[in-house]
Amino acid sequence: MINHKGTKCISTERITLRPFCYDDAENMFKNWVNDPEVTKYLSWTPHGNLNVTKECLDTWIKAYESDENYNWAITLKESPNEVIGSIGAVFIDNYLEQAHIGYCLSKKYWNKGIVSESLKEILSYLFQCGFTRIEAIHHVLNPASGQVMKKCGMKFEGILRKARKDNKGEFFDIAQYALLKTDLE
């Protein structure tokens, strides 16, 4: 059974994962949500202006009223007010005790282990909350995301053909990974 705790601050040696706040809008827009390269393999289009980002943030912040919301801002410890990415449970199935994880990071910070470090912490936290299975997917043309999942111990489960649409409305194949709580025992 899941004991929902919501989005709590989590820190490692290099990063802080924390709830988003309204002051994050400009850094979000500047660092990743308006970047076509960052959003290339995602289902949502780059934000066209700061107002789109503010509307997105408003929705996310209101969702924190529920303990069933898990959505973190990724920041470096040395600059906790500059949000460089996001990670969270984009879908939760309480009956099956499962969560689906999504993440996004400013390209300036790619290949530095930041998402892997963040994902490891989120996996641990969600299993502590009582989740049994945590899964993640990536566009097959984005193998770097799959490397993050593997690095965090997630197991490759297969390719789902034409299972999602990208931000241009085109169907694409996804690679699916998952980690079970029992995998850690």
PLM segments and residue spans:
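A short helix-loop-beta-strand connector motif used in the catalytic cores of GNAT acetyltransferases and
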Residues: T59-A73
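Conserved GNAT-fold acetyl-CoA-binding loop/helix
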Residues: T39-T59
